[in-house]
């Protein structure tokens, strides 16, 4: 079971979220049949969405769009406050490019562009906020977004580790944020600890990477666990939703599908589920337009 653990330092100066998103990213890889770099890029963006949604309350949805100019194309993910996340990468077939230490690079395949966050509170007026991509490695881009757009100094680590067959071995991350009222000496101490932390990939390789992340973040600093919540890859698509989308098409288009194609098929971009609409389904929509 994937989870996010929310914590706060005992003095109330910082909060930290740590995530195990292994099954979430593994499910995304299986559904989209992504190659190595596409898997890591999509996985990191899914984790970024989970982190942002964890900051919200009520029935809020967070959409993250990584709009790069390179071969991956757009990466779109949507997370809600119930722990659900879905997403896709425009080009799932971008294969591996590794550093000397074996880490999968995604920045060169993301390229330059924008990091766009859409916050939907369910009121019909979603809030858009955008910052430039500074590295394309997603974690740094999320930290820059939080610091610039939300005016909250933040440290972020996200990664997806693959096995020798380029399948997801482990995925997770962390967010550390300064809270109002933190003293300069406390901020400096935490900044030093974050700078000296082992690489996120090393921490994820630990037997219990959740505890390894917390130990690296807090060191000897006392902290409280506020909550532990389940997170998962879960798409909210349905045949009814796509039926409603078909209903917006002109009557002539529906008649063409009925007569020439003997039906229609729609594949959900987010989870690759195929929905089939036979001639009777289309006839029902056509009658509604008469």
UniProtKB/Swiss-Prot annotation:
Listed transmembrane segments: none
Please indicate which superkingdom the organism of origin belongs to.
Answer: Bacteria
The yes or no answer to whether the keyword Zinc is present is yes
Q: Which InterPro entries does the entry link to?
A: Heat_shock_Hsp33, Heat_shock_Hsp33_C, Heat_shock_Hsp33_N
Q: How is it modified after translation?
A: Under oxidizing conditions two disulfide bonds are formed involving the reactive cysteines. Under reducing conditions zinc is bound to the reactive cysteines and the protein is inactive.
Cite a GO CC annotation.
cytoplasm
Q: Where found in the cell?
A: Cytoplasm
- Keywords attached to this entry: Chaperone, Cytoplasm, Disulfide bond, Redox-active center, Stress response, Zinc
Statement: the UniProt record of this protein carries the keyword Secreted: no
**What S-S linkages are listed for this chain?**
235-237, 268-271
* GO molecular-function terms, A-Z: protein folding chaperone; unfolded protein binding
What processes in GO biological process is this protein linked to?
protein refolding
Tell me which HAMAP family the record gives.
HslO
Instruction: Sum up the protein's function in the record's words.
Output: Redox regulated molecular chaperone. Protects both thermally unfolding and oxidatively damaged proteins from irreversible aggregation. Plays an important role in the bacterial defense system toward oxidative stress.
NCBIfam families hit by this protein: PRK00114.1
- Name the chain's protein: 33 kDa chaperonin
Q: Which organism is it from?
A: Streptococcus gordonii (strain Challis / ATCC 35105 / BCRC 15272 / CH1 / DL1 / V288)
């Amino acid at each position: 079971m994937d989870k996010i653990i929310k914590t706060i330092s005992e003095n109330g100066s910082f909060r930290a979220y740590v995530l195990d998103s292994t099954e979430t990213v593994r499910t995304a890889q299986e559904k989209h049949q992504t190659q190595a770099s596409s898997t890591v890029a999509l996985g990191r963006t899914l984790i970024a969405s989970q982190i942002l949604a964890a900051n919200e309350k009520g029935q809020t949805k967070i959409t993250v769009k990584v709009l790069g100019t390179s071969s991956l194309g757009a990466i779109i993910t949507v997370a809600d406050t119930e722990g659900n996340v879905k997403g896709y990468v425009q080009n799932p077939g971008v294969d591996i490019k590794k550093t000397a230490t074996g880490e999968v690079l995604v920045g060169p395949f993301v390229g330059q562009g924008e990091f766009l966050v859409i916050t939907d509170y369910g009121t019909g007026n979603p809030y858009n906020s955008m910052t430039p991509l500074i590295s394309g490695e997603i974690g740094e881009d999320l930290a820059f977004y939080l610091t610039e757009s939300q005016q909250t100094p933040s440290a972020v680590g996200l990664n997806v580790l693959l096995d020798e067959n380029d399948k997801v071995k482990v995925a997770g991350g962390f967010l550390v944020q300064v809270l109002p009222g933190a003293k300069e000496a406390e901020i400096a101490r935490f900044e030093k600890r974050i700078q000296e932390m082992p690489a996120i990939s090393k921490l994820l390789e630990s037997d219990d990477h959740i505890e390894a992340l917390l130990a690296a973040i807090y060191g000897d600093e006392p902290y409280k666990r506020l909550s532990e919540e389940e997170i998962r890859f879960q798409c909210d698509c349905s045949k009814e939703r796509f039926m409603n989308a078909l209903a917006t098409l002109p009557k002539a288009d529906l008649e063409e599908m009925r007569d020439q194609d003997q039906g229609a098929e729609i594949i959900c971009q987010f989870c690759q589920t195929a929905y089939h609409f036979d001639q009777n389904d289309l006839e029902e929509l056509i009658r509604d337009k008469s």
